[in-house]
């Protein structure tokens, strides 16, 4: 998606440790008009696919998935929670995940009533790096007996193993921008 690449080049900041900071439009402050274009692009990438639900992970994926939902006939969006909560039923699907950016392990959970056998689920998230969060969401889909349509990623760090990990599982991955490298405070795309 050329408009996304341009926005990353113009507004993104490269940080030490292969971190790309896009908090000015994607995962802190959100450019809603632009995210609408992201949602339309996901619809285009998954044209002809029946989608019953969109699954993401809190927190950065929620807005993206919610906006994308309107282009998939307003299907429900389910987000995996990273923390236990009194308002989350005990009857949950649960998976272990490692966060690349936070450098910690945690469990993600989805109430069993929100992912059902036979549903066609599209996973959408902001970043793909090592693929750990996405693998955790795939595990939740499998536990539910639902069918995975594919993975929609806004920004993929193509120099890390996430895509290979997911494709080795036989999963379709659609990334809107793929970064080849982050070097000398610059972003290079594939």
Curated annotation (Swiss-Prot):
Residues given in the record as 5-phospho-alpha-D-ribose 1-diphosphate binding sites: 129-133
Glycosyltransferase found in the keyword field: yes
Catalytic reaction(s) noted: XMP + diphosphate = xanthine + 5-phospho-alpha-D-ribose 1-diphosphate
Alphabetical list of InterPro entries matching this protein: PRibTrfase_dom, PRTase-like, Pur/Pyrimidine_PRTase, Xanthine_PRibTrfase
One example GO MF annotation: xanthine phosphoribosyltransferase activity
The protein's enzyme class: transferase
Gene3D superfamilies given in the database record: 3.40.50.2020
PANTHER family named in the record: HYPOXANTHINE/GUANINE PHOSPHORIBOSYLTRANSFERASE (PTHR43864), XANTHINE PHOSPHORIBOSYLTRANSFERASE (PTHR43864:SF1)
Subunit structure: Homodimer.
Assigned protein family: Belongs to the purine/pyrimidine phosphoribosyltransferase family. Xpt subfamily.
Protein name per UniProt: Xanthine phosphoribosyltransferase 1
């Amino acid at each position: 998606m050329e408009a996304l690449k341009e926005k990353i080049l113009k507004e993104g900041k490269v940080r030490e440790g292969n971190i790309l900071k896009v908090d000015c439009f994607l995962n802190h402050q959100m450019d809603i008009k632009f995210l609408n274009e992201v949602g339309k692009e996901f619809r285009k990438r998954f044209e002809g696919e029946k989608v019953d639900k969109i699954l993401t992970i809190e927190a950065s994926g929620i807005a993206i998935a919610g906006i994308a939902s309107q282009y998939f006939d307003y299907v429900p969006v389910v987000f995996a929670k990273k923390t236990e909560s009194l308002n989350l039923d005990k009857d949950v699907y649960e998976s272990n995940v490692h966060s690349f950016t936070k450098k910690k392990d945690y469990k993600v959970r989805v109430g069993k009533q929100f992912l059902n056998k036979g549903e066609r689920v599209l996973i959408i998230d902001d970043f793909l790096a090592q693929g750990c969060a996405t693998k955790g969401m795939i595990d939740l889909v499998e536990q539910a007996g639902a069918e995975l349509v594919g993975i929609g990623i806004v920004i993929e760090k193509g120099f890390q193993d996430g895509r290979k990990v997911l494709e080795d599982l036989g999963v379709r991955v659609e990334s809107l921008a793929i970064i080849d490298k982050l070097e000398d405070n610059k972003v290079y795309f594939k």
